[in-house]
Amino acid sequence: MSIISTRLSSIKPSPTLAVVKKTLELKKAGVDIITLGAGEPDFDTPDNIKEGAIKAIKDGFTKYTNVEGMPLLKQAIKDKFKRENNIDYELDEIIVSTGGKQVIYNLFMASLDQGDEVIIPAPYWVSYPDMVALSTGTPVFVNCGIENNFKLSAEALERSITDKTKWLIINSPSNPTGASYNFEELENIAKVLRKYSHVNVMSDDIYEHITFDDFKFYTLAQIAPDLKKRIFTVNGVSKAYSMTGWRIGYGAGSKTLIKAMTIIQSQSTSNPCSISQMAAIEALNGPQDYIKPNALNCQKKRDLALSILKRVKYFECYKPEGAFYLFVKCDKIFGHKTKSGTIIANSNDFAEYLLEEAKVAVVPGIAFGLEGYFRISYATSMEELEKACIRIEKTIDVIPA
């Protein structure tokens, strides 16, 4: 009898973290690798947030807090939703967890029974399907390639709904594509949802503040307040405030769900870090004037990467509205031989080829559920990004047509 549960047998470690691990190993060995695989901002946590954490330490704020998050932080989150999204939540409709990932995990653990279906547009963030599977749910994938602007249409959604559908996942702006749903697209999705009262929606808004070209961000509960009780909104401080390591995420939804998720959290991690919670209060309540400049900086990096990669004969690029990723179509290169005679058969082969020949780390598209693509993160310096993209271009140029 194996000591490892059968439930875990189909679950794999995060492929994006695997890329980072391999890259770090190569760097340690002295190889000049440029990493375009990590999904975190390259700017530092703002000083006022750091000072908020330091003050918490000096004040001895190092004890347990409420399992579901301290009231002061939940009030800051409540105020944020009202101020930025015009959505009203009560404190008992909000939960704070150790990162957005735990919020989502708690949600599915608390709400899914065996056989419940979760509609996941592909490409998707790598953790969605495995968290659904760990919660005994069934992921239902809907391919949304570059021809669909990487977004789920209302028609495709309706075709995917069955009597077993319990959740739909919407991630906007998206990881791995940066694609973002506008008002009309969300309204069309809401029209479908009004026909199917058994379908709930998880709206993952973690990249809310990283949008480009005057794109106007909307979240579903803001557009369809009549569906609010069926919508669970996930957000956090990781991306907008560059606090990935501080591990504070939050979610808002029905009191029934929050109560159930709190039970899950009480038997796993208990409360999020007290010091990080105080830092998050400062993030949400403090100055917000660095958010737009950081987004503009990301936009400049997007434009730089696009200007180079669009020149590559085998690539097709989508211009994302947000986040800090490009999801590049590369299937035209499949079947071609490298200069060493190796055939590139899929996105894994292609990512391996770039790592070995260009010395650039990217993530294969299959990791996000859609073959024929690769993802780069442009959350790095302009100099490193330009160098990496030129390396990719030159490496592909030597492959015979």
From Swiss-Prot:
<dbReference type="GO" id="GO:0030170">
    <property type="term" value="F:pyridoxal phosphate binding"/>
</dbReference>
<comment type="function">
    <text>Catalyzes the reversible conversion of aspartate and 2-oxoglutarate to glutamate and oxaloacetate. Can also transaminate prephenate in the presence of glutamate.</text>
</comment>
<keyword id="KW-0963">Cytoplasm</keyword>
<dbReference type="GO" id="GO:0009058">
    <property type="term" value="P:biosynthetic process"/>
</dbReference>
<feature type="binding site">
    <location>
        <position position="375"/>
    </location>
    <ligand>
        <name>L-aspartate</name>
    </ligand>
</feature>
<dbReference type="InterPro" id="IPR050596">
    <property type="entry name" value="AspAT/PAT-like"/>
</dbReference>
<protein>
    <recommendedName>
        <fullName>Probable aspartate/prephenate aminotransferase</fullName>
        <ecNumber>2.6.1.1</ecNumber>
        <ecNumber>2.6.1.79</ecNumber>
    </recommendedName>
</protein>
<dbReference type="InterPro" id="IPR015422">
    <property type="entry name" value="PyrdxlP-dep_Trfase_small"/>
</dbReference>
<dbReference type="GO" id="GO:0033854">
    <property type="term" value="F:glutamate-prephenate aminotransferase activity"/>
</dbReference>
<feature type="modified residue" description="N6-(pyridoxal phosphate)lysine">
    <location>
        <position position="239"/>
    </location>
</feature>
<feature type="binding site">
    <location>
        <position position="125"/>
    </location>
    <ligand>
        <name>L-aspartate</name>
    </ligand>
</feature>
<dbReference type="GO" id="GO:0005737">
    <property type="term" value="C:cytoplasm"/>
</dbReference>
<dbReference type="InterPro" id="IPR004839">
    <property type="entry name" value="Aminotransferase_I/II_large"/>
</dbReference>
<feature type="binding site">
    <location>
        <position position="175"/>
    </location>
    <ligand>
        <name>L-aspartate</name>
    </ligand>
</feature>
<dbReference type="GO" id="GO:0004069">
    <property type="term" value="F:L-aspartate:2-oxoglutarate aminotransferase activity"/>
</dbReference>
<comment type="similarity">
    <text>Belongs to the class-I pyridoxal-phosphate-dependent aminotransferase family.</text>
</comment>
<dbReference type="Pfam" id="PF00155">
    <property type="entry name" value="Aminotran_1_2"/>
</dbReference>
<keyword id="KW-0808">Transferase</keyword>
<dbReference type="GO" id="GO:0006520">
    <property type="term" value="P:amino acid metabolic process"/>
</dbReference>
<feature type="binding site">
    <location>
        <position position="39"/>
    </location>
    <ligand>
        <name>L-aspartate</name>
    </ligand>
</feature>
<feature type="site" description="Important for prephenate aminotransferase activity">
    <location>
        <position position="12"/>
    </location>
</feature>
<keyword id="KW-0032">Aminotransferase</keyword>
<comment type="subunit">
    <text>Homodimer.</text>
</comment>
<keyword id="KW-0663">Pyridoxal phosphate</keyword>
<dbReference type="InterPro" id="IPR015424">
    <property type="entry name" value="PyrdxlP-dep_Trfase"/>
</dbReference>
<dbReference type="InterPro" id="IPR015421">
    <property type="entry name" value="PyrdxlP-dep_Trfase_major"/>
</dbReference>
<dbReference type="InterPro" id="IPR004838">
    <property type="entry name" value="NHTrfase_class1_PyrdxlP-BS"/>
</dbReference>
